[in-house]
């Protein structure tokens, strides 16, 4: 384990061991950001990182952006960086991965530490701005490191695996919290879309269905082009169309009226022929069909 805080041994620790081992010490600060560095420790290394992040801060400030505020939770297990209001964990720097910590002697507001990222294995330098607590925060991290190192020596390294498991569980919890936050945002977005859809399909915003106009008797006006469905007979077949009647009597191409066997003359026929004609006329009225009936109309022709 790296003894990066040996230069702070002459300092008097500010907190009780129980406060750092069983709980954590919270601090508020402004987070300037983090940047990759070449070495795991060194004053010149952090000085270059501070200069780089300060320059980036001035650019953001000129653009009207504010430096984000964060909450630091320091314990023997590491340094957590959280969003102050939501308590969402932004970074979880495990203590055994922190290799260097120092406050800036030229700027009493600035403090920094170097931590090795667990995923990329790159060394990242975190820089913070605290108006009154920069040196105190640095000492608190040093005290947490000292207590963790003593526990390591007392246990003979037996608790290293346990702490690795705890660190893995903390990482898993952090990932689940992040996933939970993303799911909440998605649910809120879907609810917002659903409300928008319901409003757009409401009667006030929908298409009004126009009912057909009616006359003063609440009846639909007659339209000569409207389709009239043919009336069906009882057996399901359609009735024959009603023949149209002309205003005038139809005539043939010679101008004569069509032949009518029942009205061809004003004379009387012999009784036998007249009875036959009456029988035929009555049969036609009753729908009689003629099939193979043998009769002669010669006397009729002689009378017409």
Curated annotation (Swiss-Prot):
The keyword Coiled coil applies. The modification Phosphoserine is found at residue 223. The modification Phosphothreonine is found at residue 16. GO terms for biological process: apoptotic process; lipid transport; phagocytosis, engulfment. Residues 21-176 form the PID domain. Its main location: cytoplasm. InterPro entries: Adapter_Engulfment-Domain, PH-like_dom_sf, PTB/PI_dom. It is found in: Cytoplasm. CDD domains: PTB_CED-6. Modulates cellular glycosphingolipid and cholesterol transport. May play a role in the internalization of various LRP1 ligands, such as PSAP. May function as an adapter protein. Required for efficient phagocytosis of apoptotic cells. Increases cellular levels of GTP-bound ARF6. PANTHER family: PHOSPHOTYROSINE INTERACTION DOMAIN-CONTAINING FAMILY MEMBER (PTHR11232), PTB DOMAIN-CONTAINING ENGULFMENT ADAPTER PROTEIN 1 (PTHR11232:SF78). Homodimer. Interacts with clathrin and MEGF10. Interacts with GDP-bound ARF6, but not with GTP-bound ARF6. Part of a complex composed of GULP1, ACAP1 and ARF6. Interacts with ACAP1, LRP1 and STAB2. Belongs to the ced-6 family. This is PTB domain-containing engulfment adapter protein 1. It comes from Mus musculus (Mouse). The gene is Gulp1.
